[in-house]
A protein has these predicted regions:
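Active-site/binding-pocket entry motifs
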Residues: 1-3, 118, 158
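Active-site/ligand-binding-proximal alpha/beta "capping" segment
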Residues: 90-140
Length: 162
């Protein structure tokens, strides 16, 4: 069992903040990929699918036992805590004003990922320090939550490696 304080500790945490993710496979993929990318934890809104769902557990391929996670009742309180701890928050948002790879993720970072159908709530997105978007070609409007998370986490890992 972890709590919010466990997840945000450390000098340069890399955190995934998930709002109302519904697909167990997506949640499991985010946790598994997150471990590979070096995240320090996952914070989930109460509206997110149960992490102990059998499909989620299978999709994590064991990462559920190694990546700290917690559920949060009040996402605005989470955002206030992240800001207080000087963790930069980046909302993955279709209307983001900045391209994801134009930011610096070498410092304490939290990525906000929203629900598969609706994305982040406007309230949560607007409470982030930055609203970022992943540029896309063709007529694709958005990416799967697990894929978008992977792109952001590995961009942070790439920057931190160099």
């Amino acid at each position: 069992e972890y709590d919010l304080d466990d997840i945000i500790q450390g000098s340069t945490p890399l955190i995934m903040v998930l709002e109302n993710i519904q697909d167990p496979g997506n949640l499991g993929t985010i946790v598994r990929t997150g471990e590979g990318a070096g995240i320090t934890g996952v914070i989930m809104s109460n509206g997110t699918v149960d992490i102990y769902n059998p499909k989620t557990i299978r999709a994590t391929m064991g990462s559920i036992y190694r990546v700290p996670f917690c559920y949060a009742e009040n996402m605005q309180a989470v955002m206030q805590k992240l800001k207080k701890c000087k963790i930069q928050t980046y909302a993955a948002y279709l209307e983001g004003s900045s391209v994801h790879d134009a930011q610096n993720y070498k410092e304490a970072t939290a990525f906000l990922i929203g629900n598969e159908g609706n994305g982040l709530t406007r309230e949560l997105a607007e409470s982030a320090d930055w609203r970022i978007r992943i540029p896309m070609c063709g007529k694709v409007e958005s990416l799967n939550a697990g894929i978008a998370s992977a792109i952001l986490m590995y961009e942070a890992q790439r920057q931190r490696r160099n």
